[in-house]
């Protein structure tokens, strides 16, 4: 692996999200609310691995029940078993897109208004802007870095220590529960990747511990010293690329995606999308418009974290999906054959580790560099209908 590729992997690993944790008013045991707790959370980690400090911080303001702690964002319980970055892209990604669009629209409106002002005002504004720019250019690199960080809004999360929503979320009584879940998903990904789990079974106890400790402590070198052993030596050793497509906080969609096509040409991201049939995710797009907001406001549970794909919904999930389908029947729903056609026709955005790679990117290269610690490549689809709904309801403040 080249030093360039190594730098990319390390940069992806070091990606972080600024989070503000606020204690739920229902959990207060005193009249004084504690100040929020801020944290830079690694995208590739899991909430139970980083929230021990949050528990300690709020312990003086509430009765902390360790096995009852859960997190919520705008009425949505956060699934602890998904990587933090995947949760952020799935739930907050729509709002980020909307805020950018709104800011652009506001800027355009302001520009139009400014154009109607007289020339003297315009000249004064330009001079002031130039002076400000000159002053800004004299700032040091630290200030520039701070400006970059501040461009990303904080993720405001509410912390609860009672009334655990176990109809929605898996129980997580301790860190060992996270390790067990992680190990099971890791085995699943490697079975998809190579047709067996021999490489995982061949890890000795020290290597298994280093893999877990590297993830838990967010230690890139320790984690990758073991995880690299789970990567095939060549592209020809792959059976399939382990991917998970996430749409509207529904259970992951998993399709068997080979590295090469029938002509032994490496698949690109564009080819990958063309191999995901529209019918495998079309029902998930019904979770939109007012029905989406109504379900969130009524605290209706999202799909169960026990589900590994769209065919394994539990009874709660089925009842929700049936009610959504009944109220979201479209008389003239457009027909698409696959995900690629849907993306191009609707200009839908997709996120992998928080960015949108080119459709011409090699699928296996993305997997090896943008993959997550559980050895899956998570692709988050931003549903355009969800964006429009949020715009119409002005629900962009978070």
From Swiss-Prot:
Conjugated to atg12; which is essential for autophagy. Coiled coil: none annotated. It is a peripheral membrane protein. InterPro entries: Atg5, ATG5_HBR, Atg5_HR, ATG5_UblA, Atg5_UblA_dom_sf, ATG5_UblB. Belongs to the ATG5 family. PANTHER family: AUTOPHAGY PROTEIN 5. This is Autophagy protein 5. The gene is atg5.
